[in-house]
Amino acid sequence: MSVAGRAESLGPPDSFAKRVLVTGGAGFIASHMIVSLVEDYPNYMIINLDKLDYCASLKNLETISNKQNYKFIQGDICDSHFVKLLFETEKIDIVLHFAAQTHVDLSFVRAFEFTYVNVYGTHVLVSAAHEARVEKFIYVSTDEVYGGSLDKEFDESSPKQPTNPYASSKAAAECFVQSYWEQYKFPVVITRSSNVYGPHQYPEKVIPKFISLLQHNRKCCIHGTGLQTRNFLYATDVVEAFLTVLKKGKPGEIYNIGTNFEMSVLQLAKELIQLIKETNSESEMENWVDYVDDRPTNDMRYPMKSEKIHGLGWRPKVPWKEGIKKTIEWYRENFHNWKNAEKALEPFPVQPPFV
């Protein structure tokens, strides 16, 4: 088991009130989650399990890497022997499972890898957590499991109808997680969130990709017409949602984490062009857009109801204009936090950026 950080200065397992395992903690959303937990819960030991895939960066965690209540372990959730040993040695109380392959474009050409990591890896993890009798297991899923809809809003009881390999793998993993509640009453909670944006996100996803392309004087590559719309939620807001679920979420339940803010991909590109290239001219903005072939499937909308988590007291707080400006500034200074980040800027990658 490879351990990094200040492991030698940590107390025994019982010196902390809780021991929280966060998988995929060097990735985008999970790194924000870890920073929040480490800073706000000094009596909790936060253990980051990450295999450091191409989209991960420990630079996301530099502000807390030397904290006494933080520990990094490099490892793979698909390694069942390793995962079982981790639960035995680290005495985990709570699991926040973020680790996954998430790039939709890549899922079309590497579907088996997505199935292996997202489905098998999740099964390994929830099985080990159940055997270790952890207090709570939160599985981080996606609104994409619902499939697309032009008008009907999805609630937590809506059927899963995924339309791409990534979404299918997340839906399948949900079934394994939920089965542990149904069969054993193992305290699992599932979340499904809208598109999240903000610092720390590897620039293969639409917002950091468009920002990075424009900051490198390259055009925004838009799949198809760009009329597909997405709901965008700022990273700190989704962290607050996970904290709410951690504290108040009921075992066996599913919680949508959404926002009413919705924007088409084309409008997103134009707004970023306005902010980064400082132009309001439609003709000039078109010069910074390049239309490329669409994905094999590309859902038009993911409208989602979030009243259930609102009932727990959570609502998004960060306005779009504030969040996007913070995000633009962060990428101006931190684009090279990942190795070979430039390879993420291609319109339709068919190989992982590290190849």
Curated annotation (Swiss-Prot):
GO terms for biological process: nucleotide-sugar metabolic process. Belongs to the NAD(P)-dependent epimerase/dehydratase family. dTDP-glucose dehydratase subfamily. It catalyses: dTDP-alpha-D-glucose = dTDP-4-dehydro-6-deoxy-alpha-D-glucose + H2O. The keyword Membrane does not apply. InterPro entries: dTDP_Gluc_deHydtase, NAD(P)-bd_dom, NAD(P)-bd_dom_sf. Its cofactor is NAD(+). Keywords: Lyase, NAD. Substrate binds at T142. It comes from Bos taurus. The active site is at D143, E144, Y166. Its EC number is 4.2.1.46. PANTHER family: DTDP-D-GLUCOSE 4,6-DEHYDRATASE-RELATED. Pfam families: GDP_Man_Dehyd. One of its GO terms (molecular function) is dTDP-glucose 4,6-dehydratase activity. This is dTDP-D-glucose 4,6-dehydratase.
